[in-house]
UniProtKB/Swiss-Prot annotation:
It comes from Drimys granadensis. One of its GO terms (cellular component) is large ribosomal subunit. GO terms for biological process: translation. The gene is rpl32. This is Large ribosomal subunit protein bL32c. InterPro entries: Ribosomal_bL32, Ribosomal_bL32_plant/cyanobact. One of its GO terms (molecular function) is structural constituent of ribosome. Keywords: Chloroplast, Plastid, Ribonucleoprotein, Ribosomal protein. Belongs to the bacterial ribosomal protein bL32 family. It is found in: Plastid, Chloroplast.
């Protein structure tokens, strides 16, 4: 089993953690943007099946 030879410095650990957090931030931002475009009906890349309310009445 491989073991790291030296301890990772605090600054390197902080940099890696911030990169990991930034990836999550951008993923959440894209998901929110897609949800907004779907809810307003302006989505060009996502197709949603429209349901009619007349059948229920």
């Amino acid at each position: 089993m491989t073991v790291p030879k030296k301890r990772t410095s605090m600054s390197k650990k902080r940099i890696r953690k911030n990169i990991w957090k930034r990836k999550g931030y951008w993923a959440a931002l894209k998901a929110l943007s897609l949800a907004k475009s779907i809810s307003t009906g302006h989505s060009k890349s996502f197709f949603v099946q429209q349901t009619s309310n007349k059948a229920a009445e």
